[in-house]
Amino acid sequence: MKQPLILGLLLSIALPLFAQKKAFTYSFYGQVRGDLYVESRASQEIVDGLFYLYPKDHAYDADGNDLNAAASGNFYLLYSRLGLDVKGPNIGSAQSSLKLEVDFRGSGSNWATLRIRHAYVNLDWGKHALLAGQTWHPLFGDVFPQMLNLSTGAPFQPFNRSPLVRYRFQPQGWQLTAAAVWQLQYLSNGPNGKSEEYIKNSCVPEFYLGIDRKGDGWQVGAGVDVLSLTPRKQTTIDGQIFKVSERVTGVTGEL
């Protein structure tokens, strides 16, 4: 009697799963991207020049020659990428979906290795949506310059994808966004250099709240972001270690 009972249980699980497969649709996308660049002057940059920030100031040698007045260039395919979009079944009255996207940027100076760009699940109720996973930081809004270069307006436009939980309310013509944000690839700087330990030790995520008004061909909005970090838990004075309690909190506004 045990075998038919087990078989019945397996069928009761398998049949709903088989039925749910029909509710899933997916599509792959991607690109092979080559970036060839030539700079007439030394610049502040990351990814060995692929992500341009701004030109460096004069730096003179003993003869008065500007050391930064030198050209450079290279060719990379690190930002070739592959992505998957999945539209899932309704969960209650919410439409479920997920996105997974990778490129070959790597992290730090470890280039040409796989890196997660986007990885999230989204539940959409129409006017309400809840997203959990990694995607664009809320400060990277819908308004940004269209350009061939990867920097998309950096350092003034924050180019950042982070793990977050985001809620959006979208009545007609309006968009209200609230998010709790953590750090993974884009890290705060502190006593030990760039590290995720400062926000981890803080035990408090970064918070964002913003509102946008959209019309035909125009958009205006405002937002505020609060980041509170614990830069260290201990310090050393005269060879002795002491426990410390520190917190650094910053507020950023956008318009």
Task: Tell where the protein language model's regions lie, with residue ranges.
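Extracellular loop and loop/strand-boundary signature of outer-membrane beta-barrel proteins
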Residues: L67-A70, R105, L148-G153, N189-E197, ...
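Outer membrane beta-barrel
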Residues: K21-D48, A59-Y60, G64-Y186, C203-V204, ...
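Sec-dependent N-terminal signal peptides
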Residues: P4-I13
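A short secondary-structure junction signal
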Residues: V143-F144, A179, L187-N192, G223, ...
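Detector for outer-membrane/organellar transmembrane beta-barrel domains
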Residues: D216-L255
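Solvent-exposed, glycine/polar-rich loop segments of beta-barrel outer-membrane systems
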Residues: I46-P55, T235-I241
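Sec/Tat signal peptide C-region and signal peptidase I cleavage site
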Residues: L15-A19
